[in-house]
Design a protein with these regions (language model features):
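Phosphate/ribose-recognition catalytic cores of enzymes acting on nucleotide-derived substrates
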Residues: 1, 39-159
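Anionic-ligand-binding alpha/beta catalytic cores of soluble enzymes and soluble regulatory domains
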Residues: 3-52
């Protein structure tokens, strides 16, 4: 408390994984609205957890790699979601693997390619790590999505 809010402090908070601090300084959740692009089809294929992929523009601030409890505005309403940011060590362990932003939206199956839905980051959930199997990765994604549903249900109940 008592420190001046600055873009430098907000950027540092996001990069260091202090999402609560960044959101407090912003006065609203950190959010992106980049176009949904085609991924590699791994989520909808091997994992059974189709994800919305949004590429970070080269100069854009990237929050600390990890899994986040998020909500996304699709088809006229906010939906709880789980978003992973970072390299995907379970899928691609190469040194030059791309940083991705992938969001799993439970109970949603619309085609949103090319759209720019607003994605709000509410809570840091856990770090990105390599799993021994795709089943373990899918279990984490579903667990994070369940936590997101519970988080937003509690938040909405508090209003």
């Amino acid at each position: 408390g008592g420190q001046t809010v600055s873009s430098t402090r907000i950027r540092a908070a996001l990069e260091e994984g202090r999402l609560d601090d960044a959101n407090a300084m912003l006065g609203t959740p950190y959010a992106i609205d980049w176009p949904v692009v085609h991924g590699k089809g791994i989520g909808s294929g091997k994992l059974g957890t189709p994800t919305l992929n949004q590429n970070y523009p080269a100069a854009a601030l990237q929050p600390c790699a990890g899994v986040y409890l998020t909500r996304i505005y699709l088809d006229g309403r906010w939906r709880p979601a789980a978003t992973g940011i970072g390299k995907r060590p379970t899928v691609d362990s190469s040194e030059n693997a791309a940083v991705t932003c992938e969001t799993f939206v439970p109970d949603f199956s619309g085609n949103v390619y090319g759209q720019q839905p607003v994605l709000e980051f509410h809570k840091y959930f856990c770090p990105v790590r390599k799993f021994n199997s795709m089943d373990e990765l899918a279990a984490l994604i579903h667990h994070a999505a369940d936590e997101s549903k519970a988080y937003f249900a509690a938040l909405n109940g508090a209003k």
